[in-house]
Swiss-Prot record:
Belongs to the bacterial AtpI family. This is ATP synthase protein I. It is found in: Cell inner membrane. One of its GO terms (cellular component) is plasma membrane. The gene is atpI. Keywords: Cell inner membrane, Cell membrane, CF(0), Hydrogen ion transport, Ion transport, Membrane, Transmembrane, Transmembrane helix, Transport. Its main location: membrane. A possible function for this protein is to guide the assembly of the membrane sector of the ATPase enzyme complex. It holds the Pfam family ATP-synt_I. It is a multi-pass membrane protein. One of its GO terms (biological process) is proton transmembrane transport.
Length: 135
């Protein structure tokens, strides 16, 4: 059996694009607020925290939404598991690199913007254009 793969949609046409865009906007706004009120160290620390949350989500979206169609059910499940595993590994690596390589660092800003960026996912159903209809 052949697995159908659709033509690659542009990034802005993905179903998850509004969520990723909202996360990116939130991380930029939080970074600008921190930079303005707490200084440059908190600003770039917040940027690091936001990117630690956002980049793995982009990776997951890229990895998980590659297949479509009923014939590709196994490939879809495998790609979701692989995407989630890669997301966790990437998050751990980015945290390690940030705390090992970025000096000086404001840990509260890193974790604060990280959590704030992840909170956008809780409101993802409000950001999605397509409504699921019940038969």
């Amino acid at each position: 059996m052949e697995i159908r793969t659709p033509n690659r949609l542009p990034f802005h046409r993905w179903a998850v694009f509004p969520v990723l865009l909202a996360q990116f906007v939130v991380l930029l706004l939080a970074t600008l607020v921190l930079w303005q009120w707490k200084g440059s160290v908190s600003g770039y620390s917040g940027l690091c925290g936001g990117l630690i949350a956002w980049l793995p989500n982009v990776y997951f979206a890229w990895k998980a939404f590659r297949f479509s169609g009923a014939r590709a059910a196994q490939a879809i499940v495998k790609s979701f598991y692989a995407g989630e595993a890669g997301k966790m590994i990437l998050t751990a690596v980015l945290f390690a690199l940030t705390f090992a390589g970025v000096k000086p660092l404001a840990p509260l800003a890193v974790f604060g913007v990280f959590v704030l960026t992840l909170l956008v996912s809780w409101f993802a159903p409000l950001l999605m254009n397509k409504r699921l209809s019940r038969p």
